[in-house]
């Protein structure tokens, strides 16, 4: 594993790695720090949480987010890392992606975002401003759907 360092003008320290205690801990970190997800792409967009624990006909999505390019992001968190489990998770996410648009057709996504902001103590105005920085609200949700 590569090391991660904390570097300041007068200090250089290797950060210790630590396993997550539970799936929920990792799931909560992706909610609290969605900017970590933007490190995985070339986009500078910070994803916005639509909702966590979203029930659909094929299961339950751990975290459902969207970036400011109107690209949906589905997160499924698993504790262990092995080849068979990775295959299962990929299949699970493909099932979710194929059914989500039909299952959530009645969902008011902006209301869900506001509800999630309140649940997790985020500034809903700042979150929505971030979300709509590239498109007007109506255009954004048209692209999203």
Language model features: what each stretch is:
Residues 1-145:
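Charged, terminal alpha-helix-loop-beta segments
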């Amino acid at each position: 594993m590569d090391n991660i360092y904390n570097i300041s003008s007068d200090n250089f320290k290797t950060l210790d790695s630590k396993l997550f205690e539970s799936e929920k801990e990792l799931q909560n970190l992706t909610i609290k720090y969605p900017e970590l997800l933007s490190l995985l792409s070339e986009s500078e967009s910070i994803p916005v949480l639509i909702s966590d624990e979203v029930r659909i006909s094929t299961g339950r999505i751990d975290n459902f987010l969207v970036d400011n390019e109107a690209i949906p992001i589905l997160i499924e968190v698993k504790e262990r890392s092995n080849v068979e489990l990775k295959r299962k998770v990929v299949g699970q996410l493909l099932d979710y992606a194929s059914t989500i648009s039909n299952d959530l057709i009645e969902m008011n996504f902006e209301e869900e975002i506001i509800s999630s902001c309140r649940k997790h103590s985020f500034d809903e105005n700042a979150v929505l401003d971030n979300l709509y920085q590239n498109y007007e609200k109506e255009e954004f949700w048209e692209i999203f759907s």
